[in-house]
From Swiss-Prot:
Lineage: Eukaryota, Metazoa, Chordata, Craniata, Vertebrata
Stated name of the protein: Phospholipase A and acyltransferase 4
Family: Belongs to the H-rev107 family.
pH dependence as annotated: Optimum pH is 8.
Catalytic residues, chain numbering: 23, 35, 113 (acyl-thioester intermediate)
Record organism: Homo sapiens
InterPro entries: H-rev107_PLA/AT, LRAT_dom
Compartment(s): Membrane
Function field: Exhibits both phospholipase A1/2 and acyltransferase activities. Shows phospholipase A1 (PLA1) and A2 (PLA2), catalyzing the calcium-independent release of fatty acids from the sn-1 or sn-2 position of glycerophospholipids. For most substrates, PLA1 activity is much higher than PLA2 activity. Shows O-acyltransferase activity, catalyzing the transfer of a fatty acyl group from glycerophospholipid to the hydroxyl group of lysophospholipid.
Keyword vocabulary terms for this entry: Hydrolase, Lipid degradation, Lipid metabolism, Membrane, Transferase, Transmembrane, Transmembrane helix
Length: 164
């Protein structure tokens, strides 16, 4: 299901909303995308492709956007345009097409589908999903430390009162 307000143009990044994560592809025109697909990220994969995080390899594929999206929602998301100058569309598309069929190392943390398409569009590999997760883990860790410290303080205070 497409975003009703913006049709993709060649060179646009497409964010596809899967259950629990987003899959990313590069729109190359005429209804086609190029994307980095681990073995479980098959067209219309939906929630079953969440297991792609366990894979250590992936293939660059050229497929119809509607097939990759399946029943999921998607949108054009060039949100890094405000940070980086996109490469010329011709360079983005030709670079992507040259990679079709290649097998690549895959890592959910450092070499995933979002890293792949941002590298093509901007010449820089970025993944906001991973960056956001790192921040969330950091916040959760900090909160955990505060809770432990607070409990420790309360226990010591209670022990002092009990022995006084």
């Amino acid at each position: 299901m497409a975003s009703p307000h913006q049709e993709p143009k060649p060179g646009d990044l497409i964010e596809i909303f899967r259950l629990g994560y987003e899959h990313w592809a590069l729109y190359i025109g005429d209804g086609y995308v190029i994307h980095l697909a681990p073995p479980s990220e098959y067209p219309g994969a939906g929630s079953s492709s969440v297991f792609s995080v366990l894979s250590n390899s992936a293939e660059v594929k050229r497929e119809r956007l509607e097939d990759v999206v399946g029943g999921c929602c998607y949108r054009v998301n060039n949100s890094l345009d405000h940070e980086y100058q996109p490469r010329p569309v011709e360079v983005i598309i030709s670079s992507a097409k040259e990679m079709v069929g290649q097998k690549m190392k895959y890592s959910i943390v450092s070499r995933n589908c979002e890293h792949f398409v941002t590298q093509l569009r901007y010449g820089k590999s970025r993944c906001k999903q991973v960056e956001k997760a790192k921040v969330e883990v950091g916040v959760a860790t900090a909160l955990g430390i505060l809770v432990v410290a607070g409990c420790s303080f309360a226990i010591r205070r209670y022990q002092k009162k009990a022995t006084a």
